[in-house]
Amino acid sequence: MRMTFAIVLSLFAAAALGADVKTGGSKMIPLDGGKYSVWTKQVGPAPAKILTLHGGPGFPHDYLECFEDFLPQKGISFYYYDQLGVGNSDNPDDASLWTIDRYREEVEQVRKGLGLDQFILYGHSWGGMLGIEYALAHQDHLKALIISDMTAGIDAYEAYAQKLLGELSEADRATLKKYEDAGNYEAPEYQEIMMGKVYSAHLVRLDPWPEPALRAFKKFNTKIYNTMQGPNEFVITGNFKEWDRWNDLSRIKVPTLVIAGRLGTMNPDDIKRMGKLIPNSRVVLTSGSHLEMYDAQDEYMREIVRFVKDVEGGRFRADKK
């Protein structure tokens, strides 16, 4: 019976190949010759101008859904994309897949699958790191780049994380250290400090958190996150711990927006430094946190729209260096 059902499904699939079937913008993109597939969705009419790279690693596209209330109304279409192992995409149980290099080339396969060229690449947090990597390897396909809430090296990231943790009380710091030394990052007392005092101050400064962000957390692939980053936003033990692209930023020539929240997890001085090193860039610091698309929403979306419109209209001007 299973074999018969599989044959029927394959016949239906073959018959539908040429059909003009509406999917609400969703499209699965095959990777590695069809071994895996990743989910994408176009929002707004064709042609879409932006491909979005979500954060994490392992944090699905859902938290970016607020873009739908701002970009299409300004005539800007974009693509969601859940990276392999995340959200609506295939989730293979293979830790060897969770590397920067493989994800960088995955983005290139997605670009080809969507038929994109001279497009704007948006990356938030880990997506910003991935955007930098893609730009350094495949810049000829980019029209512009948006790096949101990401610095150019993990050493700088960790240094600022320690500065932010240093603002906690001595008792709270001692409690965190006790559990970190024991490798117990799930202890309720540890989580209470991280979520109640650290994340609430620097990840998203809203109570309650927006529904799309909460939904993304429920779908979070922590296996990928733990492999690549570590146990949380402030303890880096994963395989991108040595990542550093400060010396390579000058190679990014396309118009670039570097944007971050002043109250987030990235050092504002590092964001300004990135702007000085990327020759054709604009730097914006909003009043928000790491998820500034929510807690500094109007500022953030205004700057995203302004950048896209300037690039598309040939009006973009870089900051004076």
Identify the residue ranges that each predicted region occupies.
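Alpha/beta-hydrolase fold catalytic core
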Residues: A13, L17-L51, Q73-I76, K309-K321
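Conserved loop-alpha-helix segment in the C-terminal half of the alpha/beta-hydrolase fold
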Residues: W246-G288
